[in-house]
Amino acid sequence: GDNKPPKKGPPNGCFGHKIDRIGSHSGLGCNKVDDNKG
């Protein structure tokens, strides 16, 4: 279940439209957020 997006918001936005552009090059995507957590 690591490849599944968070229960908050749709898989298209994950965190929202704020991280949408940041996660693009930051790696904070749906299934990438867990890897970059720490």
UniProtKB/Swiss-Prot annotation:
Keyword Disulfide bond appears in the UniProt entry: yes
Keywords from the UniProt entry: Disulfide bond, Hemostasis impairing toxin, Hypotensive agent, Platelet aggregation inhibiting toxin, Secreted, Toxin
Outcome of mutating residue 11 to A: Important decrease of antiplatelet activity
Tissues where this protein is expressed: Expressed by the venom gland.
Disordered as annotated region, ranges: 1-38
Disulfide bonds: 14-30
Annotated Pfam families: ANP
PROSITE patterns found in the cross-reference section: NATRIURETIC_PEPTIDE
Anything else known: Mutagenesis was carried out on lebetin-1-gamma.
The family this protein is said to belong to: Belongs to the natriuretic peptide family.
Name of this chain's protein: Lebetin-2-alpha
Organism: Macrovipera lebetinus
